């Protein structure tokens, strides 16, 4: 992105903006009704891009300028904002507000989750001293200020995700095109990446050196190849793991422990599942409040029907020992050596891993990835009723009550098939 002069300092986006029509409309409504709005969501979901797109659309409404202060690398948002506004570096928050008092500016305070208290204090002073100013904040959790509106960004729906992949792939390889052969592969790539724009953009850049089907096969096993090469983005946005680790580093010890424990649960889960996963590691009464903190910080997403879900990139970080390269989640114990209790035979002895056939082992591993029975049938090119039978056998052999427990069993075991 290049900077331009004018009424503000917004960067010019050199790539197309894909999707988010409903979110942009909601953001415009929020800023009609309120003076401060926070754009929240998980790592790589596009908070900065969406906030800057909104600000660009609002230039005419804010003749005092649309200004961005990028705060990820600072603990002093006041000085950073003063520099962005071309005011003296020694300006206080109230002095900045006073300088804006007779103007109607829109200020974007970008990436604030690491200094929420400082940014909240700055925002309060600006709103008090500059009654015509409005503020857009980006971060992985709201500031919690009176009158604050929240624009929650979810991963892209499949149609927009595929469009984004196609656009970014064609940018690096004009020969790339969606065809009847490649479209299903790209759709599966986008689904495996949970519709995260950052992950999709990083993956799309690889089509100049990899076929789409080879990229999909790599993503089935590891995410380490999702490292960007662009020097125009922040370091944490050049690597999917780095983006997620930014969130991990902001969590306290209790939140990190729950993050690791929940990583063994594939797909969606309920509070009861979370408590079961934490048995022996985290007191039962602490699970709900700590889980609420992870939801607030966009580590865990709320699903319909009082369910929760952790994106695959977050699961992989939670299952990876600190400092180790990513490996398939099912091959790794939980962080810190903690393990979920394995299913037991009536006598109390853990069932041997070798009770699964080779095909049942394949199905069990796909269950840990969150795939439904119809999806497993497509992946393995077998009938759904065959998958149903395999799942019943897995549950029976493991003494398991639900699919959620399959992940813990697979993650804990070394699993060599009995064939």
Predicted stretch roles:
Residues 346-389, 397-398, 412-413, 418:
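Helix-turn-helix DNA-binding segment
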Residues 61, 297, 396-401, 409, ...:
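Residue cluster at the C-terminal edge of the helix-turn-helix DNA-binding motif
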Residues 290, 390-393:
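Residues within the DNA-recognition helix of helix-turn-helix
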Residues 1-340:
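Aliphatic-rich helical/repeat scaffold segments used for oligomerization and domain docking
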Residues 271, 372-373, 391, 403:
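Helix-turn-helix DNA-binding elements, focusing on the entry/boundary residues of the two helices
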Residues 257, 361-362, 405:
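Pre-recognition alpha-helix immediately N-terminal to the DNA-recognition helix
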Residues 1-16, 339-354, 358-359, 415-419:
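Intrinsically disordered or compositionally simple regulatory linkers and C-terminal tails
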């Amino acid at each position: 992105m290049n900077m331009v002069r004018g009424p503000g300092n917004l960067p010019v986006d050199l790539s197309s903006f894909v999707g988010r029509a409903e979110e942009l409309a909601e953001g415009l409504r929020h800023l009609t009704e309120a003076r401060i709005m926070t754009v929240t969501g998980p790592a790589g979901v596009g908070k900065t891009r969406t906030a800057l797109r909104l600000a660009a659309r609002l230039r005419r409404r804010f003749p005092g300028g649309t200004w961005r202060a990028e705060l990820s690398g600072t603990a002093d948002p006041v000085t950073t904002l003063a520099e962005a506004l071309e005011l003296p570096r020694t300006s206080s928050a109230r002095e900045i507000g006073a300088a804006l008092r007779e103007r109607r500016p829109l200020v974007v305070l970008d990436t604030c989750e690491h200094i929420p208290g400082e940014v909240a204090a700055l925002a309060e002073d600006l709103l008090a001293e500059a009654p015509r100013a409005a503020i857009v904040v980006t971060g992985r959790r709201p500031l919690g200020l009176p009158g604050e509106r929240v624009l929650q960004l979810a991963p892209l729906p499949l149609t927009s995700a595929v469009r984004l992949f196609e656009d970014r792939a064609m940018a690096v390889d004009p020969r790339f095109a969606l065809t009847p052969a490649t479209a299903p592969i790209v759709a599966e790539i986008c689904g495996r990446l949970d519709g995260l724009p950052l992950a999709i953009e990083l993956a799309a850049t690889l089509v100049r050196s990899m076929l789409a089907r080879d990229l999909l096969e790599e993503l089935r096993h590891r995410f380490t190849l999702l490292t960007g090469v662009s020097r125009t983005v922040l370091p944490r946005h050049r690597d999917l793991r780095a983006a997620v680790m930014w969130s991990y580093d902001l969590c306290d010890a209790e939140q990190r422990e729950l993050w690791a424990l929940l990583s063994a649960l594939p797909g969606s889960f309920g509070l009861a599942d979370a408590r079961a996963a934490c048995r022996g590691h985290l007191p039962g009464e602490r699970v709900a409040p700590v889980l609420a903190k992870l939801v607030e910080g966009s580590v865990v997403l709320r699903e319909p029907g009082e369910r929760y879900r952790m994106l695959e990139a977050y699961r992989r970080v939670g299952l990876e020992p600190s400092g180790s390269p990513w490996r398939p989640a099912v091959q790794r114990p939980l962080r810190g050596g903690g393990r979920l209790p394995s299913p037991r035979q009536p006598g109390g002895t853990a069932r041997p891993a070798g009770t699964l056939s080779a095909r049942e082992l394949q199905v069990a591993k796909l269950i840990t990835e969150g795939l439904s029975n119809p999806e497993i049938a497509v992946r393995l090119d077998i009938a759904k009723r065959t998958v149903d039978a395999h799942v019943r056998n897995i549950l029976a052999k493991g003494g398991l009550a639900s699919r959620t427990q399959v992940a813990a069993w697979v993650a804990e075991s070394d699993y060599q098939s009995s064939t």
